[in-house]
Amino acid sequence: PAYTYTASCSVIEHVGATPVMVDIQEDHFEMNYDALAEAITEKTKVVIPVELAGVPCDYRRIFEVVESKRGLFQPSTNLQRYFNRIIVVSDCAHAIGTTRDGVSVAKLADFASYSFHAVKNLTTAEGGCITWNPENELDSEAMYKEFQVYSLHGQTKDALAKIKPGSWEYDIVIPGFKCNMPDIMAAIGLAQLERYPQLLE
C-alpha cells in the first residue's frame, strides 16, 4: 500500500524489482483490493499487504485477486515456480498477535515478516523474523538455511560453527547481508514472547 514504511519498498529495490504502490481505502487502513487487481501485470511476483496499526487485511480478497491473475504469472525462481502464482508476503511489523476471523495473519499469508524494533510492543531493540505458512508444505529446513545464509553475508557457517576444531573453513555462496540476531537479543525476544499474551491484554 502507498501508506507504509520504507522497509516494504526497500526489499523490492534490493532484488532489482520495481515497487508498485496500491493505495488504502478511503475510509479504512486496508488496501484497496480493486486497485490491487488493476495494478497486477505479468511482471508482478509478490503482493506485500501491510497490517497498518494492527488492522488485518482481508486475505480472502487478496487471494481471490491473486487467483484471478494466475494466468498472467510468469515465474522466474524456483520458489515462484513452486507456488506457480503471485506470492503473498504480509508486513506484520504492527501485527504481532493480530487475527482475522480468529486466525493469525501469519497463517493467512504465504510469508510474514515481523519487526522487533524498539517502538514495537514485542521488542528486542532491533531485529525481526520471517515466518512461512506450513500449509504451503515448504521444506522448512531448507528455507531456514537459505535465510541463514542471506543473514550471514552469504556465509555457509555461523560464528559458532566456525570456531569448532577443524571447522574454520566456509564458503560464501551469495552476496548476502549482515542481519542475524545476536543471542542476547534473541533471549530477550523469547522471554517477551512467553509473556506476550499478557502484553496484548
Regions found by a protein language model. Give the residues of each.
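Hydrophobic/aromatic ligand-binding patch that stacks against planar heteroaromatic rings
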Residues: 10-12, 104, 184
